[in-house]
Amino acid sequence: MFQEPLTRARHVARWVAFAIVVGVISGLLSAAFIESLTWSTNTRVDNSWFIWTLPIAGLIVGASYHYLGRGLERGSNLLIDEIHSHSEWVPFRIAPLVFMTSVISHLAGGSTGREGAALQIAAGATDPISKRLGLNPGDRSLMLITAIAGGFGSIAGVPIAGAVFALEVQRVGRIRYEALVPAFVASFVGHAVVRGLGVNYTIYPQIPDVTWSPTIAWQISLFGLVAGLIALTFVRLTQFIRGLMKKHVAWYPARPLIGGIILLVLITACGWRDYQGFSFPLMLSAMNGATSGHFEVKLLLTAITIGTGFVGGEVIPLLTTGALAGATFGSFVGGNIAVFAIVGAVAVLAGATNTPLACALIGIELFGGGGAMLFAVACVAAYATSGHTGIYHAQKVSAHKSGEVTS
């Protein structure tokens, strides 16, 4: 009579224990990573000459992957591939490799982020545990999803969205509910560890109060569709640059070296220093109602940075791109610029990652629940127009956005 409930309870307890371990590891590594990137950003800002190291930084990053991490340049796509295929273990060396090269990329001034790197660091530190425990392929997939949740929730300060992101990101059109409990536990534990260590997250402005009306409904819906096209443009441009480098530059270390030279020329010649790194000041300025930034510049520099092989991630640059695009759109339609900037940040991210639920939750956790309806509408609209291939090209398509189920 009680055999089945007891078996289920033991199964859940086992995964809760695994998730706590993953969450603690993820939180500790994310805390160190946040502090390191804060140092690298402050050092670059205080010493403007660091921009001249972009080419040599690119060479170091490329050589590190070529000689120490061949095959690991797939980044977060490696993790998603392994969730589906179980063909190879995520090696531990990816954690220090991504950590080091991300810090170098930010120190020199590449337009990159941190969330993608944090996922790889967490997975690199935890997948060897799965190997040591002898987990079967199905359980190992759950552990990788748990690591993604722990990494995202702890690095971004969004424990609910971090868990949902991990459940949503590996397949377009399907959520892995079997990983629900460990994903939430790991994400919340990782976030708690970072908080407990006294590491500060970026403080974002809260979305202004908006009265829902037919006017705001069509404006947000239209902008969501535009945000999806912006996301699609970023994805296609990054893929084009990556393909161009692969076709014409055989020696991998030369790719980020060339990327560094291009970035150096563009940034210095055009006066685009504000678009280096995370570009938090530009993002926050837009979210406070300013229209001084150009989203197309951030999009271009990020596509070059990532496409040529620098390391870090796309999430925060996409938030910045979306915020700047939202401010421009809000000004054009005569709307509240701050509202459109905040909504734009999560909408462009939703389109680029194919994770509309997680991105709507990111909006709620970072910018306040008062914008829940706006975030939901914009993220769904962006998801609809951004295509099936996002920044994580290893995503499987379980259901087309037209509604057709494939698997």
Model-found features: residue ranges?
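Alpha-helical transmembrane segments and immediately membrane-proximal extracytoplasmic
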Residues: 1-407
